[in-house]
Amino acid sequence: MKRNQVLFLTCAAAVVFLAVLHVGESAAVRSKDDPAPDKKESLKSKIFMQGSEASNFFKKRGKRSPKSQDEINAENRQRLSADERRREYYEEQRNEFENHVEEEQDEQEERSREQIEQWRQWHYDGLSPSYLYQRQNI
């Protein structure tokens, strides 16, 4: 009889143990409207790379290894385009400054011409012909 009791207690303990494990697993499963799968996906994206990144991962060179011709060409293209942009910028600035200086000189000439003309009109005595008629055609 003792043997039957031990067998019964062992089976009962196993059933209780399996029931506890089943409840534990079902509690670990999340419901569908839970936002946790998004976290799982973001964690997955942090751990795993995209295919394009993974293919380039092993192609990356070390710090001391020589550059490939493609890298050298790409760097030269970037350098040349930066130089061209810088050249265009400074040329534009120089043209704007030259235009500004030219306008200032034209305004100054206009003002001085007006002042000279006013002075001549004020000092004209009426006896000799006016300055306008004394201009020499070159």
UniProtKB/Swiss-Prot annotation:
Propeptide residue span(s): 28-64
UniProt region (Disordered), positions on chain: 58-116
Primary localisation category: secreted
Cellular compartment(s): Secreted, Extracellular space, Extracellular matrix
PTM sites of type 4-carboxyglutamate: E71, E75, E84, E88, E91, E92, E96, E98, E102, E103, E107, E110, E114, E117
Alphabetical list of InterPro entries matching this protein: UCMA
Compositional bias ranges of the Basic and acidic residues kind: 67-102
Organism: Xenopus tropicalis (Western clawed frog)
Ranges that cross the membrane: none
Signal peptide: 1-26
Post-translational modification: Proteolytically cleaved by a furin-like convertase to generate a persistent C-terminal fragment found in almost the entire cartilage matrix, and affecting osteoblast differentiation.
Name of this chain's protein: Unique cartilage matrix-associated protein
Function as written in the Swiss-Prot or TrEMBL entry: May be involved in the negative control of osteogenic differentiation of osteochondrogenic precursor cells in peripheral zones of fetal cartilage and at the cartilage-bone interface.
Membership in a protein family: Belongs to the UCMA family.
GO biological process: regulation of osteoblast differentiation
PANTHER family registered for this protein in UniProt: UNIQUE CARTILAGE MATRIX-ASSOCIATED PROTEIN
Keyword RNA-binding attributed: no
UniProt superkingdom: Eukaryota
Keyword annotations of the record: Coiled coil, Extracellular matrix, Gamma-carboxyglutamic acid, Secreted, Signal, Sulfation
Residue ranges that the Swiss-Prot or TrEMBL entry lists as coiled coil: 69-118
Organism placement in taxonomy: Eukaryota, Metazoa, Chordata, Craniata, Vertebrata
One of the record's GO cellular component terms: extracellular region
